[in-house]
Design a protein with these regions (language model features):
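Acidic-histidine catalytic/liganding microenvironments
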Residues: 19, 37, 49
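N-terminal, intrinsically disordered low-complexity tails/presequences enriched in Lys/Ser/Pro
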Residues: 1-6, 11-12
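Residue-level signature of tetratricopeptide-repeat
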Residues: 31-34
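Short, solvent-exposed mixed-charge patches
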Residues: 64-66
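Short, charged, surface-exposed loops that flank catalytic or proteolytic processing sites
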Residues: 42
């Protein structure tokens, strides 16, 4: 991962909040999803997290990694 990418599988709640449109609740939802479902298999899977829709995904797509 390059320095400006955020790893969906390793990022902390604080790191996830750096994404556009992602506040505390959404960041916590991403971490909870990861704990329940296991590691993200693709960045597209982020859209399965409650509160993360296509618009938020599109804004952050280039900053996401696994």
């Amino acid at each position: 991962l390059s320095a400006n990418k955020i790893s969906l599988n390793q990022a902390s709640v604080d790191q996830l909040q750096q994404l556009q449109g992602v506040g505390l609740k959404k960041a916590q939802a991403i971490v909870a999803y990861r704990q329940k479902q296991g590691p993200f298999k693709s960045i597209d899977e982020l859209q399965q997290v409650r509160g993360i829709g296509p618009a938020i995904f599109a804004k952050n797509k280039t900053r996401l990694g696994l």
